[in-house]
Amino acid sequence: NMTEEEFKKELERLGISVTDEKMHQLEQFYEILIKTNKQMNLTRIVEKEEVYLKHFYDSLTLVKAYSFEGDLSLCDVGSGAGFPGIVLKIFFPNLKVTLIDALQKRINYLNEVIEALGLVGIEAVHVRAEDLARQNRKFDIVTARAVASLPKLLGWCMPLVQKNGVFLAMKGNVEEELD
């Protein structure tokens, strides 16, 4: 688990700038997540210090794989509770973010978070990845977190990745995936 102080220290170690405003946005995000989680299943991780580690910090470890600086578009596939999409948007406001999810009620929740946090240049869209790909939408970065097996994820996400773009899959255990 991770206290807010430890969280800030770890982000500095990753080279991510932390401001009071960003910490306040995370705090609001946490409150809406917990409130909404009582009505619908978004996460089984609800303990604050665990959310900071397993959802917030985990989302930001993607900076080890890719630089989010600059004018980039990002699509978060199966965004669900908003990880990593919303967390990345908070810390990299330059990103143009599209969160997609197949469930309308999750989109409603994501829109509530976006509005409460005053985020701009981010949209939550009720669409499946394969349907978005049919509309020829392309992104610099496509992220997905544990929504399916890796072969399935690749099938859904790769068509959304622009030439010279990247697909960043966040999966639990690498060994499990290789079996």
Residue ranges and their predicted role:
Residues C75, P84-V87, A102:
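Acidic/histidine-rich alpha-helical segments that form the ligand environment
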Residues Y30, A81-I86, H126-A129:
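Mobile beta-alpha loop/short-helix "lid" or hinge segments that flank ligand
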Residues G78:
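Conserved glycine-centered beta->alpha loop in an early N-terminal alpha/beta scaffold
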Residues L95-T98, A102-D179:
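S-adenosylmethionine
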Residues A81-N94, G155:
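Conserved SAM-binding loop of SAM-dependent methyltransferases across substrates and taxa
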Residues S17, N41-R44, E50-V51, G82, ...:
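Residue-level preference for alpha-helix termini and adjacent loops
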Residues M2-D71, C75, R106-N108, E112-I122:
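Class I SAM-dependent transferase core
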